[in-house]
Amino acid sequence: MSSAQTDNGPLLAVSGLGKRFGGFVALENIDLTIATGERVGLIGPNGSGKSTLVNCLCGTLRNETGAVLFDGRPVDGLIAHERTRLGLARSFQLPKPFHTLNLIDNLRVPLLYTVNARPGHHLSDEQVAARCAELLEAVALADKARRLPRDLTQVEMRKLELARAVATEPRLLFADEAMAGLSPSEVEEIIAVLLRLNQQGITIVLIEHIMRAVMSFSTRLLVLVAGQKIADGLPQEVMRNPEVERAYLGE
């Protein structure tokens, strides 16, 4: 397991995680830790198990073996929305906003059903409205607050997806392919948003195929190949790893 952690232990600790689909081994004996405040890139060729790993960690899928601890608490038995209420959130590769709701109301839903569902938390209507406005400002969508998702460009839709995830007030955010299909300048916009979120205290794991973006954002890389973790370390060191070179370039 990686040594990256805080004095109080890692924010996320995974040991021996495995997942099968019938006879197919999707993940095998995955060990990893994520420390509070980190910016981690999770990379690997198509079919390497990245999405399956994220789904297991976020509660969409159930791992057959191993253990997942979030802030020291076992979460293997919790489903996705229960993990989200603890502070473990994700954005999706294919954004699925509420198409009949404007942007403010798209953010109001996770605030009401995640943040307000936490013990001891209750945001007033005024606080919810203020937080929605703050989130839209953070992703440069304040001028679209009353618009519907269908009115957004592709990069704006990506920003809305991130804002919806951040509305749950996560401590750890998995950003899954947040830049897919974007132009180089739009990729830079999303990197800037993610960096701001990290500076505000959100630990982020970026799952991404655009290596320029991964290298620009990440302070650490994890590499999956064929359901196994083959590298974990500083970006420049990982990219010089012979196993990683073979995985991407072949023999």
Task: Give the ranges of each region predicted by the language model.
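Catalytic Walker B motif of ABC-type/P-loop ATPase nucleotide-binding domains
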Residues: 173-177
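Conserved catalytic motifs of ABC-family nucleotide-binding domains
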Residues: 169
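The feature captures the beta-strand-to-loop junction immediately N-terminal to the Walker
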Residues: 43-45
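Conserved ABC transporter NBD signature motif
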Residues: 66-75, 86, 120
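Helix-to-loop junction immediately C-terminal to a conserved catalytic motif
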Residues: 58
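Conserved ABC nucleotide-binding domain
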Residues: 76-77, 135-156
